[in-house]
């Protein structure tokens, strides 16, 4: 089996894993690709009996070392079927290895849709849920909230079925499992009738963004909202989208792949110039922004199409990413501090930042579920910093990420599990009231640490 981010190194089976961005890699003992539950059971029982380590690997999109292991990688790509679809209960059951976009394609043909998605959909269903992916809407929670039930194979080969009604603690822990409790075999997810979205992009100044935020004219102004902030250009782009009935509004043609690739190439060229001559980075951001949005404020773009398609974003190229969830009421202060750092402080240490700062939101999950959800159990704002690697070159991203982390820590921020952060178990225990219960359950389910790795040891060990 050929997986793009996994390369065979030798005849003894060793492989090198690299994540999509090629920012993290590891040499593993081998790759296992079961097709059936019985094959999966044999792999896990062997690992459990012989002291082997296993980490499940999917599309490799996590911008961290959460997958990396010196043990064995386990790909569920061949366990990627739809198990059942039930329109009466508005649910679909799929095997864990299926990609999110594949689920949506099947649902769309049936006249249904996933309720909300993140920015990309090439990731596996189990990976999306296990790391607490989210979209951007105060009317929707993180994606694991929409899980109805799961079947999980433990390290000893036994299978546990859990839901809100059955094995409640197991379910609350496994909604965001970090791949540390067992291997998700299949998963039942809520669906909704298909919908289209009409989306607009509005250009505003940073000052006006904060004023509109204060007046509840941003996050409450549409069902789906996200904001991109361009600190050096003193601009923000507010993306809003609302549902309409399918095919009631003409669909906007998608940008051609050539145009996207060309834009990506030009973007890399600009950032590479900024890498070589760091002080010109603010001018490059202003130039890029003007080329894309012009000089005028107001509506810059309107598009319409199937909801799933409109919610997706084009992922340009290799990047480092850090994202933090903080209470929405504290977010304007936090964002203003990050903007001030970018404009006033980053250049003084020769560490100008890339653009944009992405800002998203979600509704709170109930207290008794999603123990490791990155929402704050109140309306939550996610602030994300991106530092690109133009033409795969190294970039000085750590000062920017430390600044964001220091700011987020002032509000007891929660880091995205699959992105870069430095918190330890002691710090995370203060922010996750149920983390101690999660850790105890993990030890009970996997006493030999089959699914443990360096990432988990660093942050939770």
Curated annotation (Swiss-Prot):
Family: Belongs to the oxygen-dependent FAD-linked oxidoreductase family.
Keyword set, alphabetical order: FAD, Flavoprotein, Membrane, Mitochondrion, Oxidoreductase
Positions of post-translational Pros-8alpha-FAD histidine modification: 61
Annotated FAD-binding PCMH-type domain residues: 24-194
PANTHER family given in the database record: D-ARABINONO-1,4-LACTONE OXIDASE (PTHR43762:SF1), L-GULONOLACTONE OXIDASE (PTHR43762)
A GO biological process held by the record: dehydro-D-arabinono-1,4-lactone biosynthetic process
Pfam families registered for this protein in UniProt: ALO, FAD_binding_4
Protein name (record): D-arabinono-1,4-lactone oxidase
Catalytic activity: D-arabinono-1,4-lactone + O2 = dehydro-D-arabinono-1,4-lactone + H2O2 + H(+)
Compartments where found: Mitochondrion membrane
EC number: 1.1.3.37
InterPro entries reported for this sequence: ALO_C, FAD-bd_PCMH, FAD-bd_PCMH-like_sf, FAD-bd_PCMH_sub1, FAD-bd_PCMH_sub2, FAD_lactone_oxidase-like, Oxid_FAD_bind_N, Sugar_lactone_oxidase
GO-annotated cellular components: mitochondrial outer membrane; mitochondrion
Cofactors named for this entry: FAD
Organism superkingdom: Eukaryota
Enzyme class: oxidoreductase
Pathway(s) this gene product operates in, as recorded in its UniProt entry: Cofactor biosynthesis; D-erythroascorbate biosynthesis; dehydro-D-arabinono-1,4-lactone from D-arabinose: step 2/2
An annotated Gene Ontology molecular function: FAD binding
Predominant location category: mitochondrion
